[in-house]
């Protein structure tokens, strides 16, 4: 027995071309395929990429190649860790001078200790038996 005629004669919906889709450009697996090196560099620089030139060079050399994704992964691994975590930021005090290395190490050590004490106090378990709004709500819910 064969396949029904309706299945054989009708193309799938994704293959049917409508007047709107006939004029569209066909999708490309590599969006950088026809781009110039300067265009790719500008794209990465505008996005704030620190390695814009290096990344653009790799993509341009590998345009149309399956190695583009792997090259981008390698660059991502090379990226240094971000140093803008709030616990690492140090704001100098108005009266202190940065020229004295001994003073700056003492300030850093004391600020690290105060930062650690804040973290541990924030994680301390709460005593739900104490009178107050949180204890009262906890008793109602449980």
From Swiss-Prot:
Residues 15-28, 96-119 have a biased composition (Polar residues). Pfam families: TC1 (PF15063). Induction: By vasopressin. Residues 74-88 have a biased composition (Basic residues). Keywords: Cell cycle. Signal peptide: none annotated. The keyword Cell cycle applies. Transmembrane segments: none annotated. GO terms for biological process: positive regulation of MAPK cascade. Residues 1-28, 74-142 are annotated as: Disordered. It comes from the Eukaryota. May be involved in MAP kinase activation, epithelial sodium channel (ENaC) down-regulation and cell cycling. This is Arginine vasopressin-induced protein 1. The gene is Avpi1.
């Amino acid at each position: 027995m064969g396949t029904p005629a309706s299945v054989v004669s009708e193309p799938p919906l994704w293959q049917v071309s409508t007047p709107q889709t006939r004029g569209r450009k066909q999708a490309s697996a590599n969006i950088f395929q026809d781009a110039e090196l300067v265009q790719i560099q500008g794209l990465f620089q505008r996005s704030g990429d620190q390695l814009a030139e290096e990344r653009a060079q790799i993509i341009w050399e590998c345009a149309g190649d399956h190695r583009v994704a792997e090259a981008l992964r390698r660059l991502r691994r090379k990226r240094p860790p971000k140093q803008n975590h709030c616990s690492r930021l140090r704001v100098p005090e108005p009266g202190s001078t940065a020229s004295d290395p001994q003073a700056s190490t003492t300030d850093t050590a004391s600020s690290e200790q105060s930062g650690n004490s804040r973290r541990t106090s924030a994680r301390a378990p709460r005593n739900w038996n104490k009178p107050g709004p949180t204890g009262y709500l906890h008793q109602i819910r449980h």
